[in-house]
Amino acid sequence: MQSTLSQSPGSRFSQYMALTKPRVTQLAVFCAVIGMFLATPGMVPWHVLIGGTVGIWLLAGAAFAINCLVEQKIDAMMRRTAWRPSARGEITTPQILLFSAVLGSVGAWTLYTFTNPLTMWLTIATFVGYAVIYTLLLKPMTPQNIVIGGASGAMPPALGWAAVTGAVPGDAWILVLIIFVWTPPHFWVLALYRRKDYENAGLPMLPVTHGEKFTRLHILLYTVILFAVTLMPFISGMSGAVYLTSAVLLGAVFLAYAWKIHRDYSDELARKAFRYSIVYLSLLFAALLVDHYARPLLGV
């Protein structure tokens, strides 16, 4: 184990940042920010935008730090995650707990102060859903971990919406539903080409418990459902033609990947599909934002 005294402040900072899973956090916070803007026809007040963004990021980082702590032995057995400082023993359990507690406390205070109590409590509930219910209970016990546990990961748009309005109306839940349905195919393509990793770690991911063929079929089925669900913002009147066009085009590409995986699987194809799924969700929510402000300008 590397001595903590021999590390530079910059190296130590990078290790703690790694615990927050920055790439995953960025996507979650991005979806939350989009939720903020969709909640109002005008601009989001600056104190809400900044306070909400920072508070949600801090609590998300706190949840991911707990995830790294709980799964440090599992991470050490997987090639994809063995580099994490928690898996390498470079940060101790008390240090991770303290780090998570500080992030979570400051995040909760920030949300309470700059947004509203509802946003704070919803974000804390999301923290519990991910760090406790998903990480401790669902992930090691059932192949449906991603399906059930995806509820907590799908919450960011509702958190952003609540930060602005103090409520979570039907339109916000449509956005939550999109991410909820997107989550299984996104993670299952990863689990397909990382199947050996999950087998070695003893995690009951779908390809491990039900096989590759079953997983490929369910990726296709969930992607078809996702395509239909992404039409709901247009059907409900929340979004217009700009979003609809984007959703159809982006969804068609995702469907093409899912169909190819179902018919002619390869690890390289699964890697490409996994990377595209991240781009897909980012562009889909960006299209929601563009459509939201373009509709008044276009008079529709």
UniProtKB/Swiss-Prot annotation:
Protein name: Protoheme IX farnesyltransferase
TM regions (residue ranges): 24-44, 46-66, 94-114, 118-138, 146-166, 172-192, 217-237, 239-259, 278-298
The keyword Transmembrane is annotated on this UniProt entry: yes
Further comment found in the protein's record: Carbon 2 of the heme B porphyrin ring is defined according to the Fischer nomenclature.
UniProt xrefs under PANTHER family: 4-HYDROXYBENZOATE SOLANESYLTRANSFERASE, PROTOHEME IX FARNESYLTRANSFERASE, MITOCHONDRIAL
EC number: 2.5.1.141
Gene name per UniProt: ctaB
UniProt xrefs under Pfam families: UbiA (PF01040)
Enzyme class: transferase
Function: Converts heme B (protoheme IX) to heme O by substitution of the vinyl group on carbon 2 of heme B porphyrin ring with a hydroxyethyl farnesyl side group.
Keyword entries, A-Z: Cell inner membrane, Cell membrane, Heme biosynthesis, Membrane, Transferase, Transmembrane, Transmembrane helix
Single GO molecular function: protoheme IX farnesyltransferase activity
Organism: Burkholderia cenocepacia (strain HI2424)
GO process annotations (BP): heme O biosynthetic process
Cellular component terms per the entry's GO annotation: plasma membrane
Family listed: Belongs to the UbiA prenyltransferase family. Protoheme IX farnesyltransferase subfamily.
